[in-house]
Design a protein with these regions (language model features):
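Glycine-rich beta-alpha loop elements in corrinoid/cobalamin-binding modules
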Residues: 1-115, 122-127
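Conserved Radical SAM active-site core
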Residues: 1-10, 140-144, 148-261
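Short helix/loop capping segments that flank catalytic or ligand/cofactor-binding pockets
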Residues: 19-20, 27-29, 120-124, 130-133, ...
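Predominant activation on well-ordered alpha-helical scaffold segments within soluble catalytic domains
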Residues: 27-30, 131-138, 197, 259
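Detector for methionine-enriched segments
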Residues: 21, 33, 86, 129, ...
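N-terminal [4Fe-4S]-dependent radical SAM core
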Residues: 94-98, 102-164
Length: 261
């Protein structure tokens, strides 16, 4: 459908939205819900409970009444209302730029957008995961197989990645056509060599493994172990790219860790 839709929170009638790579917000949400059930003695979490709980959890979104949202000049950012964006492509483009900038900040602001149904509230993301947290996520016992509903069907995309190893998250390329920064941020979080080698070992035991890996890579370009030399400077930066229009002098783009791996 060639139209500018409202937030998926409005269209889907969902109580809570989790965005980005969801491990941290899902753990925080379920832990908070468990604590609520223990404290209240209730048998289940209601829709109202879920909305109330999510308001204090990063990397979630919810739909609120206008009188429920107190604007904080320092920590909030107002987007142009959906109705105004329907009349102006420039305002929609400005919204996209604002969202892109906030997704690239160390200390992002909360985003607010008014719709006919209420105010869409998008809480800022969690801090970048640690290597230990990322290892834990990748070390879970995945089957490495397509969903069972594809049984017997060839999936070209699966053929390309089945013997591939993801070694980091995040991308500081800032390409205009890409939304990786909105999903994963521009700051790189790396898996340990031990975790990567455990996955390589698992791949080597696959029935169709021929003895070579298709690639060791990131979500796009390979930026393993690359980072800002001075993180305090990074905290003040909202550039979508560390390499365009020219490479940032604060970027440590040393390839030695990748070569060692």
């Amino acid at each position: 459908q060639d139209s500018l839709r409202k937030s998926i929170l409005v269209d889907s009638k969902a109580d809570v939205l989790v965005y980005g790579m969801g491990e941290q917000p899902i753990i925080a949400l379920t832990s908070a819900m468990k604590e609520h059930l223990t404290a209240s003695g209730a048998e289940y979490v209601t829709a109202g409970d879920a909305r109330a709980i999510s308001r204090g959890i990063r990397q979630t979104g919810y739909l609120a009444r206008r009188d429920e949202v107190l604007f904080d000049e320092e920590n909030d950012r107002r987007l142009a209302p959906h109705g105004e964006c329907m009349k102006s492509k420039e305002k929609q483009a400005a919204n996209f730029l604002a969202i892109e900038k906030e997704s690239n900040r160390v200390n992002a602001k909360r985003l607010l957008q008014e719709t006919d149904e209420g105010v869409v509230v998008i809480n800022p993301p969690f801090p970048t995961m640690t290597t230990e947290q990322l290892d834990h996520s990748f070390d879970l016992p995945y089957t490495r197989l397509p969903h069972p509903k594809y049984k017997g069907k060839r999936i070209p995309a699966y053929d390309m990645i089945k013997h591939s190893v993801n070694i980091h998250r995040g991308c500081f390329g800032g390409c205009a056509f890409c939304t990786i920064s909105a999903h994963q941020g521009k700051f790189i979080v790396n898996r340990s060599q031990e975790s990567i080698l455990r996955e390589v070992e698992a791949i080597s035991r696959m029935d169709d493994f021929k003895g070579y890996l298709s690639d060791l890579g990131g979500p796009s370009a390979n930026m393993y172990m690359m980072k800002g030399k001075n993180r305090e400077l990074c905290a003040k930066c909202s550039r979508p790219s560390c390499i365009q229009p020219k490479i940032c002098p604060n970027l440590d783009a040393d390839h030695s860790p990748l070569l060692e791996l």
